[in-house]
Amino acid sequence: TKRKPQYMKVEAFEHILDQIKPYTDYLYFHVKGEPLLHPHIDTFLDISHEKGFQVNITTNGTLIPKVKEKIILKPALRQINISLHSMGGNKDYDHKDDYMEHIQEFIKEVREKSDVIISLRQWDLDEKTIPERGIKIADKVYLNQDYQFKWPDLGAEEDDGIGFCYGLRNQIAVLVDGTVVPCCLDGEGVINLGNINESRFSEILEGPRTKAIIEGFSRQYAVEELCRKCGYRKRFNK
């Protein structure tokens, strides 16, 4: 991301949860960020539980050995998605040989101590490989495979815009600075629907740009330029 690196403050997180509570019971900690980097990840999980939310964490898994004791027994934690494919593009990680061993140890510990679901993601298949989705490896442990996709980018080639997406229907994202965007792929905040620190979440949902996106996809059309340059959206057209 080109945005300034920063950690969401605990007070801001509490405010966001109070705003979104009428609309969902589930939180997903990601959006082009590594949630296990946050120094207060345990506090965030505690607050989530206090306010009645279940949490899904998406991580590349490299920090699991360091922070597992802060998260593994938290009652709010519902599922951990581990992006195995992230290792393919991480040239700076010095412990690749130990990576899978640490993941396996973590899975064993999770199964012994909790009911948390583990999803191992391998989203780097090429077109010659047919993915098998939702392979059950063990109780509450799954392997999910899929093709590589291109992240939306205003500099990318634009398609005809025809198609559907679940953005704003079953997901919405709040960035660290409070910017609200339609989905977790808009990590740069290009489609800025408003700021949850400045406007009520209910007002942002009723905003003209928000409504235009929803109505557009109801007609099978992407009204936003970034959406017309999103490779992930094409998955829903198959």
Q: Each predicted region: which residue ranges?
A:
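Histidine-centered beta-alpha loop that forms part of the nucleotide-sugar donor binding/catalytic region
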Residues: N60-G61, S83-M87, W123, L185
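Well-ordered, non-membrane alpha-helical segments in soluble/globular domains
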Residues: H95-E109
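Structural recognition of alpha->loop->beta junctions
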Residues: L17, K21, K68-G89, E132-W151
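Conserved alpha-helical substructure of the radical SAM core
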Residues: T1-I80, K91-D97, N237
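Short, acidic, Ser/Thr-enriched surface-loop or helix-capping motifs
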Residues: V174-L175
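Short, small/polar residue-rich loop motifs at catalytic or cofactor-binding pockets
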Residues: Y166-L168
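C-terminal accessory region of radical SAM enzymes
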Residues: K108-D160, L185-R235
